[in-house]
Amino acid sequence: MDTMGRHIITELWECNPDKLNDIDYIERLFVDAALRSGAEVREVAFHKFAPHGVSGVVIISESHLTIHSFPEHGYASVDVFTCGDRIDPATASQYIAEGLDAKVREDVKLERGMGPIRVPEAQVAISK
């Protein structure tokens, strides 16, 4: 495959529910994750749901970072997609997992581009 980008789908469990429900914290965390990975932030949009949960996106020149949080379950669904090979999406994904105090993390790493997607086995990290 002619790789045009790398995509990490991250499942985070046993996260800090207060952090998962704090829109300001999550927005700062995601912008910081993008910047720490070397990305250039273009747009930021986050929404707080009632009674709980946050969804948001950080658009970067190289693609995007997204989250959907479920504080009532201690769970967050995170995507980090970067075009090219200058930015390492794993840097941002790791920073986000640590920032949400995730005790269990599962990643699926995909190469995106011109050709069929090959889906590898998920990699699970438990930090109990």
UniProtKB/Swiss-Prot annotation:
Q: Which residues form the active site?
A: 63 (schiff-base intermediate with substrate), 68 (proton acceptor), 83 (proton donor)
Which molecular-function annotation in GO is an example for this chain? adenosylmethionine decarboxylase activity
Source domain of life: Bacteria
Q: Which InterPro entries match?
A: AdoMetDC_C, AdoMetDC_fam_prok, AdoMetDC_N, S-AdoMet_deCO2ase_core, S-AdoMet_deCOase_pro-enz
Pfam families under this entry? AdoMet_dc
Q: Which reaction does it catalyse?
A: S-adenosyl-L-methionine + H(+) = S-adenosyl 3-(methylsulfanyl)propylamine + CO2
Transmembrane intervals: none
A cellular component term, taken from the record's GO annotations: cytosol
Swiss-Prot/TrEMBL cofactor(s):
pyruvate
Residues bearing PTM Pyruvic acid (Ser): 63
User: What happens to this protein after translation, modification-wise?
Assistant: Is synthesized initially as an inactive proenzyme. Formation of the active enzyme involves a self-maturation process in which the active site pyruvoyl group is generated from an internal serine residue via an autocatalytic post-translational modification. Two non-identical subunits are generated from the proenzyme in this reaction, and the pyruvate is formed at the N-terminus of the alpha chain, which is derived from the carboxyl end of the proenzyme.
Q: How does it assemble?
A: Heterotetramer of two alpha and two beta chains arranged as a dimer of alpha/beta heterodimers.
Known PANTHER family for this protein?
S-ADENOSYLMETHIONINE DECARBOXYLASE PROENZYME
Stated role: Catalyzes the decarboxylation of S-adenosylmethionine to S-adenosylmethioninamine (dcAdoMet), the propylamine donor required for the synthesis of the polyamines spermine and spermidine from the diamine putrescine.
Q: What is this protein called?
A: S-adenosylmethionine decarboxylase proenzyme
The source organism is Exiguobacterium sp. (strain ATCC BAA-1283 / AT1b)
Lineage per the UniProt record: Bacteria, Bacillati, Bacillota, Bacilli, Bacillales
